Amino acid sequence: MLKYFGTDGVRGVANAGLTPEMAFKLGRDGGYVLTKDKKDGERAKVLVSRDTRISGQMLEYALISGLLSVGIEVLEVGVITTPGLSYLVRAQGADAGVQISASHNPVEDNGIKFFGSDGLKLSDAKEEEIEKLIDAPEDKLPRPSAEGLGTVTNYHEGASKYLQFIENTLPEELGGIKVVVDGANGAASALISRLFADMGVDFTTIATHPNGLNINDHVGATHTKKLQEEVVKQGAQLGLAFDGDADRCIAVDENGNEVDGDHIMYVIGSYLADHGRLKKDTIVTTVMSNLGFTKALERRGLKNVRTQVGDRYVSEEMRANGYNLGGEQSGHVIISDYHNTGDGMLTGLHLLYVMKDTGKSLSELLSDFKEYPQRLINVPVKDKKDWKEHKRITEAIKKVEEELSDEGRIFVRPSGTQSLLRVMTEAPTQELADKYCEEVAKVVEEEMGSK
């Protein structure tokens, strides 16, 4: 297991766990690893962007200093979504990109996420290479002077280029359906009105006035209550919520019900399949997707391939086997005909397009999807790495698996960013899901709990 990199880059409390000093080292060491193969005389180019957190500029300046110290030319994009940066890295032919964001996490946190020249997250091997340099007893990387140093160029026009890209993925304007959009006071806040107005959408917004401190503050993809209330209050047909860096989208139907990533993929995937455009009649998800999702697909003659948790692994599976739709229950949805990473705004507009083209409400499009009751318990633990070595835990899991058979499941995994073990169950009834989840969580707490 990696020391600094989690499932989504390096994260921590800004100016405590994730310090400017650490950002400098990540810029210097990460920049070197990603650009060391440039031919002599060729300047490496790296794009840097951030979300709206107050700590973003502090970490950005430190990170950029690290990049400049190994001779890298930096294009400073400013505030933009994570998928926006991913797109611009490819569009600009850059060697790499770095996004400063902690996504859906609270404002105290921040993170640093690297992308390769293909706009994709780094492999475990690349992250391990960076970590070895960070922990090296001596810094032996090049230290150019004068003309060998990098410089910074403002590239704030990148946002307009990214919005144009999204608009070009849709064949027509999207008027006629009333939408409420929640920007989470995050990176999408300044982009939503431009994009949705350009597409002719009848929309209103909430949480699009970031002040550096209010990102994800009871709004956004992980806090949809306010959006649900607004959809009902305004008589809207759809609500769309993004998270802090807008790489995920959660929807709300016309009745105020939350619609997660599984449901969104089902709607878009079914539409693509009906039009002969769902490659291999398959949608790729992680092991966290609801069992009801798989069974709903099977009723339509479609298939579901599952990966370990993390949109990076979904993306890898899609590219390896030629699938064009995948994602996570949490709202990361990859429509690879257009983009190679989860993109909240792209996903939201394509969901809206399906509603417009079919003339159906979101609840109608989901009428065949019967979700299995689910329970998730996060158990704080001392050390999440060796949980499989605890016989009582593995035996408790096996017992539940045998009792549920193919009418439910249990899944235990370590958090990628926190000292937690996540215990998740699905069963035909909520009572059973609660019972089995609580049983296993109790054993985990007794064996490994941090209290």
UniProtKB/Swiss-Prot annotation:
Activated by phosphorylation. Keywords: Isomerase, Magnesium, Metal-binding, Phosphoprotein. Binds 1 Mg(2+) ion per subunit. Transmembrane segments: none annotated. Disulfide bonds: none annotated. The active site is at 103 (phosphoserine intermediate). Its EC number is 5.4.2.10. It comes from the Bacteria. GO terms for biological process: carbohydrate metabolic process; peptidoglycan biosynthetic process; UDP-N-acetylglucosamine biosynthetic process. One of its GO terms (cellular component) is cytosol. Mg(2+) binds at residues 103, 243, 245, 247. Its cofactor is Mg(2+). The keyword Glycoprotein does not apply. It catalyses: alpha-D-glucosamine 1-phosphate = D-glucosamine 6-phosphate. The modification Phosphoserine is found at residue 103. GO terms for molecular function: magnesium ion binding; phosphoglucosamine mutase activity; phosphomannomutase activity. Belongs to the phosphohexose mutase family. Catalyzes the conversion of glucosamine-6-phosphate to glucosamine-1-phosphate. This is Phosphoglucosamine mutase. It comes from Lactobacillus gasseri (strain ATCC 33323 / DSM 20243 / BCRC 14619 / CIP 102991 / JCM 1131 / KCTC 3163 / NCIMB 11718 / NCTC 13722 / AM63). The lineage of its organism: Bacteria, Bacillati, Bacillota, Bacilli, Lactobacillales. The gene is glmM.
